[in-house]
């Protein structure tokens, strides 16, 4: 697949997650649902331009430029905790978008969203299980994900 195919596929996954979570939030009378749906339509647009386009997905490229492109993306997009300085400062709207992004990535890579929340993100963004931010993340991921089938 080409770089553009992978990027568009990821954005489609995130947009679909934002639509689903947004509709569920609207059903709960939460006004951020509509804004989350809107964000799904502009998610990761910065990846189409400049250093992000040139260096985010080029495995043969200069690692220093790839690192710079990742940093640029993270501090330029409010669905990344780095934009806010800390995950604890993220408004709920962008925390919801982050959860939608994480769920898309987990699906694309065949990994566990729950493991990312409990281990990967907890370590990267320095939060503890059962902290206030963890509980918010779990609430939004619980709204996004369908419940598993009950055993017969």
Language-model features and meaning:
Residues 1-152:
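Metal-dependent phosphohydrolase cores
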